[in-house]
Regions:
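Bacterial N-terminal signal peptides that target proteins for export
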Residues: 1-10
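Divalent-metal (often Zn2+) His-rich catalytic cores of metallo-beta-lactamase-fold enzymes
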Residues: 220-223, 244, 250-251, 261-262, ...
């Protein structure tokens, strides 16, 4: 083990002996956008073409331990002989241009401050070490994307883990940021080490807007059936997938319900990066059933392309 990595693990072990804290100190409030809807209504809407112009953007290349991305104790992973290793992954941001409501992004991409990721002041030294931050290779900044789109009217997060909020610093203060319920309040000992970083990455966000999922776990975001938020808890309590009905067909952005291509193709949930592994497996199975029911859907896992 590298000496610095050993130090980090000692610090983390010490943190685990302490009371936990929330993921962030940023305030939350119930989102006013969207309406609760039954699952069957979403299924029926998929049959019609959608008005949204969709584009998937590669924000950065990266590499992190496979054991965080994938449950290596799953029988399929064991049978495949998968071992922990540094796994090449990508950070994506998705742009949604709605002809009536404006330009939105799913997740936030990479801020200009990460062009020299190893020296980014928002990320603490311990988090840089733990998450291989110096290995980030930015391909597109959120500032560049915002100029290309002519502005960004809102951000729909799949969850508030660091790698999904790294682009918010390029947006103007006051741009609304939407996330699932419970992510901000989630208590964990590891947040002792990560909360400062999360707060700094959310510095332009005065209040997080939390989706108000009902019993169906489905929200019709714009009220016109063009974009659906799907509660997919497990990786985090508020993890949310988004189904966009677009000019290029239905697009399902699943966040980190599974990070990798192998995970999606084999139905294996994330590993140590998930808050609740069994719940992750349930949510992943639900999203896979949706994709089987509607084979026209293009699926986008969190950090690798299919």
């Amino acid at each position: 083990m590298k000496p610095l990595a050993a130090v980090f693990r000692l610090v983390l072990c010490a943190a685990l002996l302490l009371p936990g804290c929330s993921a962030t100190t940023v305030d939350t409030q119930p989102a006013q956008l969207g309406r609760q809807a039954p699952y069957a209504e979403m299924l029926a809407a998929i049959e019609a073409p959608g008005p949204i112009v969709f584009e998937k953007h590669l924000a950065a290349d990266w590499a992190v331990p496979l054991s965080g991305l994938l449950n290596l104790e799953h029988p399929k992973a064991v049978a495949a002989g998968l071992q922990d290793r540094e796994e090449p992954i990508q950070i994506y941001v998705y742009s949604l241009r709605h002809p009536q409501y404006g330009n939105f992004i799913v997740d936030s991409g990479m801020a200009e401050s990460f062009l020299d990721a190893g020296n980014n002041d928002d990320v603490s030294a311990i988090v840089k070490l733990a998450m291989n931050i110096p290995l980030l290779d930015v391909q597109l900044t959120t500032a560049e994307l915002q100029r290309k789109l002519g502005g960004i009217d809102g951000v729909f997060l799949t969850h508030i883990h660091m790698d999904h909020i790294m682009g918010l610093g390029d947006l103007d203060p006051g741009v609304p940021v939407y996330t699932g319920p419970g992510d901000a309040a989630l208590t964990s000992a590891t947040h002792i080490a990560t909360r400062g970083t999360t707060d700094r990455l959310l510095a332009n966000t005065e209040t997080l807007q939390e989706w108000q999922f009902g019993s169906s776990g489905i929200i019709d975001v714009f009220g016109d059936g063009s974009l659906w938020a799907i509660h997919s808890p497990g990786h985090t309590p508020g993890s949310t997938a988004y189904l966009a009905l677009t000019s290029s067909g239905p697009q399902l952005m699943i966040g980190d319900a599974t990070h990798t291509r192998w995970g999606w193709e084999n139905g294996v949930e994330p590993g140590s990066y998930s808050d609740n592994g069994p719940q992750s497996a349930i949510s992943l199975a639900r999203l896979q059933q949706l994709a089987r029911d509607k084979p026209a859907i293009a699926v986008h896992p969190g950090h690798q392309a299919l």
